[in-house]
Amino acid sequence: MNEILSITLSFFTFLIFLCAPLNIYKSETFRFRSVHQNGIANLIINLNFLIIISLLPFKLISYLPFYFTALVLISIFNFLKKGEIFKFEKLIFSFFFVLFLIISLDVAVKLNLGWDAKWFWYIKSLFFFQNFNFGYLSQYEFNSFHPHFGSYLWAFFRELSLNKFEYSGRLFYVFLYLSSLLFLIDKFKENKIQNFIIIFLLLLITYNYKIFSGLQEILIFSLLIITTKLIYEYLNYKKNFYLFLIILCMNLILWIKAEGIAYFMIILVGLNFIKNFNFEKRSLLLFSSFILILFKTFIYNYFQISLNDQPYFVEYILKLDLQTIIFKLKNIIIYGTFYSLKNIIFLIVPIIFFINYKILFKDQFNKIIFIIFMLNIGFIVSAYMFREMEIIYSLRTTMDRIIFTSSGLYVFYLINFLKKKNYFRRYIL
């Protein structure tokens, strides 16, 4: 019973981050097509603000109550000024809560952490939870392998929880995951059965306790889902606010894992293939991206933290011979195919490209997703080809997670394809 109460309070705590600082309904500029999507903008803004806060030389406990209280007060102000933002549809709100409760109970019962979580992410979260600041991470031997932000969120929401148990911080990962899936649905009340099927289908395909065992892939996966949906919205409605949110999502990805820079660049290149993308917006996108990367580089240099201690060395790359390249490529294809068969989203995407071959480069969204997919494949191959590590061990221990993370780029593309072809109505409903 205590766990259920704590999980319920955590859910409502997380909701505050959807309800402030913006009252999205106040301006047409900030309006999505359904109420439950509006909060995602606030969530993205809040998470970016937390990145800045996490870098400050203050103890977590010294500012967390003030920050959360400010969000609560702003939420109340928004409610009094324009209550619509709080009028979550009862059906989707109940659905959201039930799913969150079920998955959170699974997390609370199983508890075991993934290998990387034990050695990297949890230890980093303890630094913040025990009121050390970002600067102290330089004292942690394995800190430079990956950025800190996912661990910071773990500590931040653990401190906000009722029981302050370790798993309480990870419940935010569940919340972000479910928020990203529900973000795909424009109008939940319309075609309720279809929308229920979509969510359950995605849960069936993607849910596994392992992704909530402290590993950070679920954060990037969720943010990639949101990003591709925002790209689609921008292509259709040309609202600058969508482009702004895309840039903020890219920034979040940059601070979560070392490979975040690869997804950052993949999205950046894909966006530059938008037709009629005027010089002003293109320049703003490139300049913003440059500033974000430069800012992270500056922060790491200032705190004397290595940007990336992953096993990639120019000397090793230059010494690669043809036999080694063929051996690595063969195994990359074998393991890539095997894990793609286990991840149906990644497997289906090329099939959709084949079905849509007539409009692949005529339709803007299809073209950009195709370019992103090709860049994604190039990244996966390069990541293993140029890595100075035993290839079989590396593939067996990490390929499944890279495939899972990357599949976040194609979740909305898959759902959008099924809707447009009326496959749900034709074969399921």
For each feature predicted by the language model, list its residue ranges.
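Membrane-embedded glycan-lipid processing machinery
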Residues: 146, 154-157, 165-175, 207-219, ...
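Membrane-embedded, hydrophobic transmembrane alpha-helices
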Residues: 1-86
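Membrane-embedded helix bundles of polyisoprenyl
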Residues: 43-50, 96-100, 171-188, 193-234, ...
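Extracytoplasmic catalytic/substrate-binding loops of multi-pass membrane glycan-assembly enzymes
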Residues: 110-124, 130-153, 164
